[in-house]
Amino acid sequence: MLMITSFANPRVAQAFVDYMATQGVILTIQQHNQSDVWLADESQAERVRAELARFLENPADPRYLAASWLAGHTGSGLHYRRYPFFAALRERAGPVTWVMMIACVVVFIAMQILGDQEVMLWLAWPFDPTLKFEFWRYFTHALMHFSLMHILFNLLWWWYLGGAVEKRLGSGKLIVITLISALLSGYVQQKFSGPWFGGLSGVVYALMGYVWLRGERDPQSGIYLQRGLIIFALIWIVAGWFDLFGMSMANGAHIAGLAVGLAMAFVDSLNARKRK
């Protein structure tokens, strides 16, 4: 899907969506801080942008109001669609995003039933030389979470960032970022604290770094992260490093993950520029 534009007024957004529907182009609206207009069929992007330019010149043109009536939006003439919570979740997340979320939830439930130690014996970073060829361990540490707040925080960010990467750049790109960041952030963290750690935060920080820098250097990629959020991520790293909140944080994984994401975004945006 491709985001075409955002409107501060949801009624204006609906007017444009209704008009394009009469032209045979289906757009959808997602409500965030503004009304974001999305196009599923990206092959029609140029046509939609041309119509948008005409619409913005005179959104009060009678043909747009007429389109709303044709689309069945009478009453005040316009209204914006409301999407149920789960529909919004489904629309943003691709299959890889969902598989990871489900896997983390299943592992979390197992940890509540069997105990943390029992699950860690199977999924933790290799804690004995005899386990170094159990290759899944270099990645499955990311599935383990030790509190409800821990898993909710990580999965919210994973859904928001991983879903955006998968929708815009494909499942393959999300898989590559996830595997590389899980491996390298885990390696660094075990150097800091030993093998007994877990959580998706190393991958989440990689996605933060990737989405932010890729959006800055390659806006046409369609992904972005507000600068305020990347500043928040850096503040959180500093807070964890100096133990300002008295919480046990995987500081090594956070720093390594962020570095991995930034490096991958730099390389990918460089390659994108070369292709132009």
Swiss-Prot record:
Enzyme Commission identifier(s)? 3.4.21.105
Q: MF terms per GO, please?
A: serine-type endopeptidase activity
Q: What class of enzyme is it?
A: hydrolase
Source organism superkingdom: Bacteria
Q: List GO terms (cellular component aspect).
A: plasma membrane
Give GO BP annotations, semicolon-separated: proteolysis
Q: Does the keyword Cell membrane apply?
A: yes
Q: Which residues of this protein are catalytic?
A: 201, 254
Identify its membrane topology class: Multi-pass membrane protein
Q: Where are the transmembrane segments?
A: 94-114, 142-162, 169-189, 192-212, 229-249, 250-270
**GTP-binding among keywords:** no
Catalytic activity reported:
Cleaves type-1 transmembrane domains using a catalytic dyad composed of serine and histidine that are contributed by different transmembrane domains
Subcellular localization is given as:
Cell inner membrane
Which InterPro entries would you find in this protein's record?
A: GlpG_N_sf (IPR038236), Peptidase_S54_GlpG_N (IPR022732), Peptidase_S54_rhomboid_dom (IPR022764), Rhomboid-like_sf (IPR035952), Rhomboid_protease_GlpG (IPR023662)
The record describes the protein's role as: Rhomboid-type serine protease that catalyzes intramembrane proteolysis.
Q: Tell me which family the UniProt entry assigns to this protein.
A: Belongs to the peptidase S54 family.
How is this protein named in the record?
Rhomboid protease GlpG
